[in-house]
C-alpha cells in the first residue's frame, strides 16, 4: 500500500494545549538513532489522547474506523533543537532517513513559530 505525501494544517483544535501537555512529560534518549529527546510511547500516559491522534491521522488516508482494520501505531513527542542558531542554515533543513518496517509515518509540528 502506498500513501501520498500530505500536508494538513491545524491538526489539533488547540495546538497550544497539546504543546503545553507535551512540555510537561518526561523526555529521555533511550535507544534509537534520532536527534533530540523523546517521550515514552504516548499510550502509556494517555490512551485516549493516543487513540484520538491515531484515528485522526489515519482518517486522512482512509476510513480506518472500521472493525476489520487492525493497526499497530506508536506515538511520541520529540524535542529536537536546531543544529545552527541561524534558522536558515542548511543544517536545520532536516534529517533524511527511512524508518524500517514502517508503512506510514507522520509528524505534527508544535513549534509556536
Q: Which residue ranges define each predicted feature?
A:
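Fe(II)/2-oxoglutarate oxygenase catalytic core
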Residues: 1-113
Amino acid at each position: 500500500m502506498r500513501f501520498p505525501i500530505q500536508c494538513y494544517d491545524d491538526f489539533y483544535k488547540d495546538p497550544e494545549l497539546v504543546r503545553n501537555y507535551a512540555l510537561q512529560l518526561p523526555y529521555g534518549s533511550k535507544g534509537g538513532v534520532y536527534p533530540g529527546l523523546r517521550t515514552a510511547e504516548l499510550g502509556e500516559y494517555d490512551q485516549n489522547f493516543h487513540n484520538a491522534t491515531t484515528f485522526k491521522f489515519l482518517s486522512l488516508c482512509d476510513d480506518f474506523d472500521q472493525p476489520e482494520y487492525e493497526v499497530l501505531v506508536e506515538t511520541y513527542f520529540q524535542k529536537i533543537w536546531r543544529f545552527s542558531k541561524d534558522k536558515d542554515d542548511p543544517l536545520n533543513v532536516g534529517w533524511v532517513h527511512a524508518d524500517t518496517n514502517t508503512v506510514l509515518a507522520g509528524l505534527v509540528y508544535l513549534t509556536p513559530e
